[in-house]
Curated annotation (Swiss-Prot):
Name of protein: Glucoamylase
Record Pfam families: CBM_20, Glyco_hydro_15
Keywords for the protein's UniProt record, in alphabetical order: Carbohydrate metabolism, Cleavage on pair of basic residues, Disulfide bond, Glycoprotein, Glycosidase, Hydrolase, Polysaccharide degradation, Signal
Lineage: Eukaryota, Fungi, Dikarya, Ascomycota, Pezizomycotina
Active site per database record: D200 (proton acceptor), E203 (proton donor)
Cysteine pairs bridged by disulfides in the record: C234-C237, C246-C473, C286-C294
Family that this chain belongs to: Belongs to the glycosyl hydrolase 15 family.
Signal peptide residue numbers: 1-18
PANTHER family registered for this protein in UniProt: GLUCOAMYLASE, TREHALASE
Region described as Disordered: spans on this chain: 498-533, 616-640
EC code: 3.2.1.3
An annotated GO BP: polysaccharide metabolic process
Length: 640
C-alpha cells in the first residue's frame, strides 16, 4: 500500500504529488481535496490515537501539535467544543466512522468537568469556566486569562447535537444517562455566570464579549429543548435565555457589532463574524435580534469588519471593495505582529454562504438602509427593497455575494501549504504561514465553510421560538444543578447505513430509508429523511474504491466535469489510503458535487515515477442524487 498521502499530511511532501496538487484547476476541486486533508488533520490532533499528539489522553482535542513558539499543546474547552460540533455535524450527515471519536470526547469531558482548577471546581460550577487543561486531563495552573465563559456553552451545543441524534435513533437511555448530566452542568454554568465578566475568545479582553453572549443564548435555548426531550426540564435555561438575548442587543452600535465592552479598541473584530456563524439557524429568518448571517445588522457588520483589514495588510493592497481580502482577528492586533488568520478569513466566507442559504430558503432578499452599503459594494445598482428570487436583481446580487464569498476561500487556498496544511496565521506581507502549525480550529473552520458553501447546514437550534427580545432587560442569574459524571462504558451503538446514514440538512436525524442504484459496476447508496426539508444544491459523494496497490502508487479520480478535472490527469482528485489494510484495500475520497449532475468518470493509478495507468473501459457513469434531505451519497467501486 502507499503511505504517500499520509506522509504529505505530516509534512513529507513527495514531489510528484505536490506537482499534482499544485495544478488544481478550480476552487471546487481544491476544496474536495482540502476537506479530506482537514478531516484527517483534526483526527491527527485528537488523543489517544492522533498521529500528531502522542501523550494526549483519549478524546482530548489538542489545539495544535506545536510545543514551542508558541506552545499550544493543550486542550481548550472552546476550541474542543467548536471542533466536536463540526465532527458531530459530519456524523449526523453520514460520516458514522466518527462515532468512537465523539464518544471518547464526551467521556473525556466527564473527567475534565470534575477537575479542580484555578477558576474553581464543579461543586460551585466555577471550575467549568477554566479555559484550558493539560492534555493528560490535569489542571493547568500557570498564569492565564481566566475565566472564559464561552467554553461551557460551546461544549453543551456539541454534546446536544450528538444527544439529539441518539434520541432520533432510539438510544434514549444513553442520551438521558450519559449526555444530559454533562450538558446540564454546562447549562447551569451559563445560567449562573453569564452576567459576570470574563476573557474573550482571543483571551485578551476581560469584559463582556459578543461571541460569548451569543453562544450562551443559543446553548440555553437548545438546552431547554433537549432537557424536555430526555424527560427533564431546565428552568434556569428558560428564565435566563430571554435576558441574555436582551443583553445581546446592546452590542449593536448602529453601524456594526461591538466585539467587547470594557475595551479601548475600535470594536471591529472577527469575534462578531464568528458569533454570527455559530448561532446560524437554517430555519431562521434574517433576524436582527439574533444577528442571523443574512440579517441587515450582520451584513453591515461584515462589511465594517472586513474593510477594517483592507489598508493594514500588504496582502490586501490594490484590492477593490468588491473583492475579498485577508481577514485577521481585529485591526489593532499585535500578536505575532498582527496577521490574518485562516479561521477568520474562512468565517468571513461562511457568513456569506449562510446568508445565501437563508435567502434561497425564504425565496427573497431584502436590502435595508442598514445593509445598503454592504450590497452596493458588491452590486453598484443595489437599492433598498425586497427582491424575489425570480427577479434579475436577486440573481445579480446572489451571484456577486457568492463570488465575494469564494474570494475569501481562494485566499485561504493560496496560503495553505501545498499539502493542505494550515497553521493559525499567515503573514500579512508575504503570506507565509506563522504561529502554531496545524491548528485544529483552522481545519474545523475549513470544513464548516465548505459545507455551507454546498448548502449542507446544521440542525436548527430553535431560533424561531427564541428571537423575541423582552421589553426590559434584567441583570439576573439562576442556579442550576451540578453533578459529577463518570462514563465507564458506552452501550453498543449501531449507526445504521454505514457511512451513508444521515440527518436531513435542516435538522431531523430520523433516517427512514436507504435506496440503492447501480451503474456500470458501481454500487451507490444515498440517505434521506422523512421530514419536510429543503433540497440541497450539492451532495457530498464518497467514492469507495477497492484497489490493491504497492508502495509508491496512488489512486486518483478523474471525470467529465470540472470538479473531477475534466479528464485532465494532473487535476485529478487524490483518494486517501488511511483506512487501507491488506484484507480491505480501501481507497476513498469525498467530493462535493452539484445535485442532479450526470457525468462519466474513471480511476487512475499514478506510479512513483508519475506515470499514469488508466483502469479499463468503459467509462463509469453516475448521476448525483437530488432529493429532499439527501446530503450524502456513497459510490462503491472495484478497480478494473
Amino acid at each position: 500500500m502507499s503511505f504517500r498521502s499520509l506522509l504529505a499530511l505530516s509534512g513529507l511532501v513527495c514531489t510528484g504529488l505536490a506537482n499534482v496538487i499544485s495544478k488544481r484547476a478550480t476552487l471546487d476541486s481544491w476544496l474536495s481535496n482540502e476537506a479530506t486533508v482537514a478531516r484527517t488533520a483534526i483526527l491527527n490532533n485528537i488523543g489517544a490515537d492522533g498521529a500528531w499528539v502522542s501523550g494526549a489522553d483519549s478524546g482530548i482535542v489538542v489545539a495544535s501539535p506545536s510545543t514551542d513558539n508558541p506552545d499550544y499543546f493543550y486542550t481548550w474547552t472552546r476550541d474542543s467544543g467548536l471542533v466536536l460540533k463540526t465532527l458531530v455535524d459530519l456524523f449526523r450527515n453520514g460520516d458514522t466512522s466518527l462515532l468512537s471519536t465523539i464518544e471518547n470526547y464526551i467521556s473525556a469531558q466527564a473527567i475534565v468537568q470534575g477537575i479542580s482548577n484555578p477558576s474553581g471546581d464543579l461543586s460551585s460550577g466555577a471550575g467549568l469556566g477554566e479555559p484550558k487543561f493539560n492534555v493528560d486531563e490535569t489542571a493547568y495552573t500557570g498564569s492565564w486569562g481566566r475565566p472564559q465563559r464561552d467554553g461551557p456553552a460551546l461544549r453543551a451545543t456539541a454534546m446536544i447535537g450528538f444527544g439529539q441524534w441518539l434520541l432520533d435513533n432510539g438510544y434514549t437511555s444513553t442520551a438521558t444517562d450519559i449526555v444530559w448530566p454533562l450538558v446540564r452542568n454546562d447549562l447551569s454554568y451559563v445560567a449562573q455566570y453569564w452576567n459576570q465578566t470574563g476573557y474573550d475568545l482571543w483571551e485578551e479582553v476581560n469584559g463582556s464579549s459578543f461571541f460569548t453572549i451569543a453562544v450562551q443564548h443559543r446553548a440555553l435555548v437548545e438546552g431547554s429543548a433537549f432537557a424536555t426531550a430526555v424527560g427533564s426540564s431546565c428552568s434556569w435555561c428558560d428564565s435566563q435565555a430571554p435576558e441574555i438575548l436582551c443583553y445581546l442587543q446592546s452590542f449593536w452600535t448602529g453601524s456594526f457589532i461591538l466585539a467587547n465592552f470594557d475595551s479601548s479598541r475600535s470594536g471591529k473584530d472577527a469575534n462578531t463574524l464568528l458569533g454570527s456563524i455559530h448561532t446560524f439557524d437554517p430555519e431562521a429568518a434574517c433576524d436582527d435580534s439574533t444577528f442571523q448571517p443574512c440579517s441587515p445588522r450582520a451584513l453591515a457588520n461584515h462589511k465594517e469588519v472586513v474593510d477594517s483589514f483592507r489598508s493594514i495588510y500588504t496582502l490586501n493592497d490594490g484590492l477593490s471593495d468588491s473583492e475579498a481580502v485577508a481577514v485577521g482577528r481585529y485591526p489593532e492586533d499585535t500578536y505575532y505582529n498582527g496577521n490574518p488568520w485562516f479561521l477568520c478569513t474562512l468565517a468571513a466566507a461562511e457568513q456569506l454562504y449562510d446568508a445565501l442559504y437563508q435567502w434561497d430558503k425564504q425565496g427573497s432578499l431584502e436590502v435595508t438602509d442598514v445593509s445598503l452599503d454592504f450590497f452596493k459594494a458588491l452590486y453598484s445598482d443595489a437599492a433598498t427593497g425586497t427582491y424575489s428570487s425570480s427577479s434579475s436583481t436577486y440573481s445579480s446580487i446572489v451571484d456577486a455575494v457568492k463570488t465575494f464569498a469564494d474570494g475569501f476561500v481562494s485566499i485561504v487556498e493560496t496560503h495553505a501549504a501545498s499539502n493542505g496544511s494550515m497553521s493559525e496565521q499567515y503573514d500579512k506581507s508575504d503570506g507565509e504561514q506563522l504561529s502554531a502549525r496545524d491548528l485544529t480550529w483552522s481545519y474545523a473552520a475549513l470544513l464548516t465553510a465548505n459545507n455551507r458553501r454546498n448548502s449542507v447546514v446544521p440542525a436548527s437550534w430553535g431560533e424561531t421560538s427564541a428571537s423575541s427580545v423582552p421589553g426590559t432587560c434584567a441583570a439576573t442569574s439562576a442556579i442550576g444543578t451540578y453533578s459529577s459524571v463518570t462514563v465507564t462504558s458506552w452501550p453498543s451503538i449501531v449507526a445504521t447505513g454505514g457511512t451513508t446514514t444521515t440527518a436531513t440538512p435542516t435538522g431531523s436525524g430520523s433516517v427512514t430509508s436507504t435506496s440503492k442504484t447501480t451503474a456500470t459496476a458501481s454500487k451507490t447508496s444515498t440517505s434521506t429523511s422523512s421530514t419536510s426539508c429543503t433540497t440541497p444544491t450539492a451532495v457530498a459523494v464518497t467514492f469507495d474504491l477497492t484497489a490493491t496497490t504497492t508502495y509508491g502508487e496512488n489512486i486518483y479520480l478523474v471525470g467529465s466535469i470540472s470538479q473531477l478535472g475534466d479528464w485532465e490527469t494532473s487535476d485529478g482528485i487524490a483518494l486517501s489510503a488511511d483506512k487501507y489494510t491488506s484484507s480491505d484495500p480501501l481507497w476513498y475520497v469525498t467530493v462535493t458535487l452539484p445535485a442532479g449532475e450526470s457525468f462519466e468518470y474513471k480511476f487512475i493509478r499514478i506510479e512513483s515515477d508519475d506515470s499514469v495507468e488508466w483502469e479499463s473501459d468503459p467509462n463509469r457513469e453516475y448521476t448525483v442524487p437530488q432529493a429532499c434531505g439527501t446530503s450524502t451519497a456513497t459510490v462503491t467501486d472495484t478497480w478494473r
